[in-house]
């Protein structure tokens, strides 16, 4: 008789955002007259930029003619996109990354979950706490997390690096040396970031201890401060210890289009084995490439028109972040984030738990956010709001929160 992967049975409950959706749907059904404003899941609301739409239309037209039709994409992605990524996101910033070290995919979420497949099962992982749930859950699925403690909401074989107000929501080096370190800056969910010097410290730590860093840079486009690195490869030595994940979802609004990429330098090795070669083998076996029309849309992100339009769009969301941050601060909340990231991290009032505040916000302000405890034990007593709504709804949400 067949057997299942019983690691899936170890996962506690449903995925965080699925749980939120169920609670919101139940409330909506019971209160159909209520207008609910959603500042929870990090989905964008602004339409695709005109330069991207033009590129999509052109690519669709190409697909309608035999002479310009495209089928399966190359394993790594089309050269036109990889060259644009290498130049604009890396080489123009002084980072030594070549086009053939870039793997185009349908998004950073898939890559962040799949990258663990090329590592041995007994590798020890370290994650920031609070953390984007995908990093932990996919390692649970792979049998790498150990056993779950319901009391502490932690896994026995996962090293948690607390990110609290005391350390400005930036992790300290773990006393127990891990094999794989997950870092995300600007950070989801706290909206915090670290300086380039701090990031250099992590690169040095990884190289010294034989670790690999999986660096999620999905929110890089929102960086506004000069002392924050836009890529880990700005740091000396990163080519021998770091994998970087990037997304077109938040910088270009591709949440409904799907495009991302992973960078694995050829200098990154385990003994004599290139991780680049392992990921290439995995990629070629399990993936047939992002669609041609989507990759052409990705190329338009790097056009002069695309850059200008997307800078304006990022500014729109960051203005929302300012509205949320200032509004909550004026209302007496303790808030952080919102400077280099589209997330605002707030302390729940009156010693409420994260889920108690979720219910309070939903029922009394008709606003949906994300409970901090859903991101890990250090998130308890905190709450995340996103700046990805439209401006009018964002202003209204803050006014409704102030009236609670």
Regions found by a protein language model. Give the residues of each.
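PLP-dependent enzyme catalytic core of the Aspartate aminotransferase-like
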Residues: 87, 91, 95, 351, ...
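N-terminal small-domain helix-loop-helix segment of the aminotransferase-like
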Residues: 2-106, 301-305
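Helix C-cap/helix->beta junction micro-motif
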Residues: 31, 142, 208-209, 331, ...
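Conserved core of the PLP fold type I
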Residues: 66-206, 220-235
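Conserved core segment of the aminotransferase class I/II
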Residues: 151-153, 234-315, 322-326
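A short helix->loop->beta-strand "cap" motif at the edges of active sites that frequently abuts
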Residues: 123, 208-212, 239-240
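Conserved glycine-rich beta-strand-loop-beta hairpin in the small C-terminal domain of fold type I
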Residues: 295, 299, 314-325, 335-347, ...
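Conserved PLP-binding catalytic core of the aspartate aminotransferase-like
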Residues: 47, 317-318, 331-364
